[in-house]
Curated annotation (Swiss-Prot):
<dbReference type="GO" id="GO:0005829">
    <property type="term" value="C:cytosol"/>
</dbReference>
<comment type="pathway">
    <text>Carbohydrate degradation; L-rhamnose degradation; glycerone phosphate from L-rhamnose: step 3/3.</text>
</comment>
<dbReference type="GO" id="GO:0019323">
    <property type="term" value="P:pentose catabolic process"/>
</dbReference>
<keyword id="KW-0456">Lyase</keyword>
<keyword id="KW-0479">Metal-binding</keyword>
<dbReference type="GO" id="GO:0046872">
    <property type="term" value="F:metal ion binding"/>
</dbReference>
<dbReference type="InterPro" id="IPR050197">
    <property type="entry name" value="Aldolase_class_II_sugar_metab"/>
</dbReference>
<keyword id="KW-0684">Rhamnose metabolism</keyword>
<comment type="function">
    <text>Catalyzes the reversible cleavage of L-rhamnulose-1-phosphate to dihydroxyacetone phosphate (DHAP) and L-lactaldehyde.</text>
</comment>
<dbReference type="InterPro" id="IPR001303">
    <property type="entry name" value="Aldolase_II/adducin_N"/>
</dbReference>
<dbReference type="GO" id="GO:0019301">
    <property type="term" value="P:rhamnose catabolic process"/>
</dbReference>
<dbReference type="Pfam" id="PF00596">
    <property type="entry name" value="Aldolase_II"/>
</dbReference>
<protein>
    <recommendedName>
        <fullName>Rhamnulose-1-phosphate aldolase</fullName>
        <ecNumber>4.1.2.19</ecNumber>
    </recommendedName>
</protein>
<feature type="active site">
    <location>
        <position position="115"/>
    </location>
</feature>
<dbReference type="InterPro" id="IPR013447">
    <property type="entry name" value="Rhamnulose-1-P_Aldolase"/>
</dbReference>
<keyword id="KW-0963">Cytoplasm</keyword>
<dbReference type="GO" id="GO:0008994">
    <property type="term" value="F:rhamnulose-1-phosphate aldolase activity"/>
</dbReference>
């Protein structure tokens, strides 16, 4: 069967096209990695046929033998649909965790995204929390990026602002938003910082840069970032209209959490409200 007909390739094509349409992945900005199961690739590829090996600059032993489809370095999301094999690659992490075995794509000696260290470290962190985690997505969601210039970069305060902008936010990301300091992209340092935040939050903000999101499937991750971005957009409108005059109270957020069976990140809502609702 043609690899281009594989459901996971089609998902990557549709998602990158949509992200480019939204303006969140200008030029070659943004990247996606998708953890694949061997049974998913077997109808389309022979895993013993390695096209070439690509060295890595960090130890990925914890992902040894695992398969991924990833976006390429310097590749434009707008081109993925028409030239998938040039802009995407299916890889396996070698048994020693020091190199990648290319099984398909990344033609003309292309290499995976320069953010692969951050992706792989985030996969490792999230798999330790949720063994079903499969997607890591990075993009430059416009309003979240803008908020990193104008809003206090305290995780609790930032998260609460988003929760209060749209009722669905607490339901979609009760674990809040992690925030790292500004760091040089494409380095192991930013990967380590991101992965540390991923232990507790599925969303991590890179100030003055973009957002990282993780989840079990493409819809979940895209929806996660999309929801936070919508809240950031509403925040932008609210500020432009003169600021907040009324919002969702902590008491109402507790009621919301109870109704949808989610647990807000500890300490992010007024504890006295939590106790009152238990009486």
């Amino acid at each position: 069967m043609n690899v281009l007909q594989a459901p996971f390739v089609e998902e990557m094509v549709k998602t990158t096209k949509n992200l480019y349409r939204l303006g969140w992945d200008e030029r070659n900005g943004g990247n996606i990695s998708y953890l694949l199961k061997e049974e998913e690739i077997l109808p389309f590829l022979n895993p013993t046929q390695v096209l070439r090996k690509i060295p890595m600059k960090f130890d990925a032993t914890k992902l040894a033998g695992k398969y991924f489809i990833v976006t390429g370095s310097g590749k434009y999301f707008k081109n993925v649909c028409d030239a998938s094999s040039e802009n995407l690659g299916i890889l396996r992490v070698s048994e020693n965790g020091q190199e990648l075995e290319l099984l398909w794509g990344l033609e003309d000696e292309a290499v995976p995204t320069s953010e692969l260290p951050s992706h792989f470290m985030s996969h490792i962190a999230r798999l330790a929390v949720d063994p079903e985690n499969r997607i890591v997505m990075h993009n430059h969601a416009s309003h979240l990026l803008a908020m990193s210039f104008t809003h206090e970069l305290d995780e609790k305060v930032f998260t609460r602002t988003l929760w209060q902008m749209c009722t669905e936010c607490l339901v979609v990301f009760p674990d809040g938003v992690g925030i790292i300091p500004w760091l040089v992209p494409g380095t192991n340092e930013i990967g380590v910082a991101t992965a540390e935040k991923m232990k507790e939050s599925r969303l991590v903000l890179w100030p003055q840069h973009g957002i990282y999101g993780t989840g079990r499937d493409m819809d979940e991750v895209f929806g996660l970032i999309e929801t936070a971005e919508k809240a950031a957009e509403v925040y932008t409108y609210v500020c432009a209209q003169g600021g907040v005059r009324q919002t969702i109270s902590d008491a109402d957020l507790w009621r919301l959490a109870e109704a949808f069976g989610v647990t807000p990140k500890v300490g992010y809502l007024e504890e006295k409200v939590s106790k009152r609702r238990k009486l």
